[in-house]
Amino acid sequence: MITLVDPNDSRAVRNKDNVLALYDLMIDRKKSEEATARFVGSTYVQHDPLIADGSDALGKYFGQVTRQRAKARVVVHRIIAVGDYVWAHVNFLNLFNDDPNDTGVAGVDIYRMDADGKAIEHWDVLQLVGDPKNSAPWVAPNVPRANPNGMF
């Protein structure tokens, strides 16, 4: 994992640590309600149209996902924290299927954190990973990649 955070910015370090702990507890350890109670503020604003506002809604959404998908997990490839903002480049695996060869969904999550280090706002950009030989598996699965660079 690549981490970009000023070690002298204690707020940014704490916020980065809290986002990593949120992912671990909510998705990898399947304790979403506990995770959101600890790391998400009650006034949480969600910009992903699939999930309602509020920490309870986030906990319920991922609780349902992880109860249905025992293999669900997240791999954090990059994380950047500056002040109240944390950006994470992640790969969500087995959120939507149980395929052991699932390539998952790539995401960039952006969190705004409050003074207590809890997430109070979230944006994301999501993209299917798909076959690494294809350029755009969600639009044109038969178009070959134009470069050898991986998604992560």
Feature annotation, model-predicted:
Residues M1-F152:
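C-terminal and inter-domain tail/linker signature
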